[in-house]
Each structure stands twice: as C-alpha cells, then as structure tokens.
Amino acid sequence: MQHFIGIDFSGGANAGRKIWIADGRVEHEALLIETCLQGEALPGSSRQRVECLAALRAFIRSADAALIGLDFPLSLPADLMKGQTWLQFIRLFSDCYTTPQHFRQACLHAAHGRELKRRTEIETKTPFSPYNLRLYRQTYYGLRDVIAPLVRERAVRVRPMQSRRLGVPSLIEICPASTLKQLQWYCPYKGRSIAQRAARLTILRSLQRVGVQLASQLKPIVLADPEGDALDSILAAWAAYRSRSQLDRLPHDPLYQREGYVFV
C-alpha cells in the first residue's frame, strides 16, 4: 500500500471551502504529502455542498487502491441501527432520514434523549456522539452523499465493515483530535492568534519527526489556515498511513462490523 489520502470533511452549505484533502504517497519509507487542497479546487467542484460532494465522490472513485481516512462517523451506535447489518443500514440511510434535522431527532428519540456513543468512540475518546449538535450534519451528509452512493456502486470498501478488494479504495474513519491526544501532541491550534499559528507549526514539526514530509509549497498554506482544516487533512492522511498494518490485524468483532472503528 503506497497511496494515502486524508479528508477533513464538512456538511456545511459552503462545504467546498471547509473540506480539505491531503494526498500522499510513500517515498523512501516516509509519507510525502504531495497536495493539500480545498474541496472547491477539485475538478467540477464549487463552494456549494451539492457540487463539492459530487466532485469528492468522483475523486474517491479515481483513487485506485488508496487508503483514505475520513473524519466523520461511518456508522451509528448499534442500539440505533434497528437490528440491521451495516450494509443494510447504509443502503437504507437516505430512506430512513430525510433531512439532517430528522436524522438528529430520530436518533435522540430512539435513544430516549441521550447522546449515545459507539464503543470505538469511547475507546478512542472522540469528543462527540455521531448525532451531537456539532457533528450531526457532518455525519448525515457524509453517510448520505458520500458513503452510501459509493457503497451502492461498489466503488469503495469501508473497513472494517467490508473486506478489502484489490484495486478499490479502502475507506476508514479517523479523528485528528484523538490522534493528537493519544500521542500527547494536542494543543489549541485552531484560530488566528500567534500562539495558535505556532501550535500548528509545532504539530507539523512533530509530524516531520515521525517521517511525514510536505511538498515545499504546502507548509505556508497549512500554517495560514486559521481553522486548522488543512492540518486536519494531513493528520487524517497520516492516521491512514500509520493504520495500514492494523487493518488486517483488527479482531473480527461483530460490534466493530456494525458500528465501525476509529483508527488513531
């Protein structure tokens, strides 16, 4: 496996501005990030969500055997899946939930007002439930407009719910914040202050020490992004890279097969 991509996702109306994609390949036993661009820069894309997500699907389809890290939930807690397998759940997702608001309210109703977490979210200490107020739009549009169409087309394999298939991109769920916290690298890095820009530089230097290299033109782009989304996409690509050997060693756990697994 030589090709690794990280996608910092957004379900916002101007998703093309918020989504960032880092594309890297292995070179001399290191991960070289060759490009890091906004979703609106993809061929056929725009700042608007509908056009951007269509372009993102096309980009993922064309990624051959890449391992792609996505930073949104790829499933729900098993208690909310109505006894379905993951494949049944994803195929019926758009029929079950007509809007992001309907999705959040249906989950809250089924959970008796609680924000349930999946086992993997508890294990990796991700900050939010998939239908938390800050995350539910991201979950909804990610599942409905990215994952479900690609799965129906058999254009991708979503791990660990599906087995690997040669020549087809593998998608995994990652969480940049959890990765940073696991490595004890976390510090407030989102914002326009000098301290927050310095924190982005510190994280980039930490990545460099573990073998992540950036094409020369990318460093100023990443440091200048005050929202930290460009950096998050690079962290997502690196999380995919460092998870490559873990994929085939992950225990065959029925709960992970339904709820998914966050690779940090």
Residue ranges and their predicted role:
Residues M1-I5, F9-V264:
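RNase H-like (RuvC/DEDD) metal-dependent nuclease/polynucleotide-processing core
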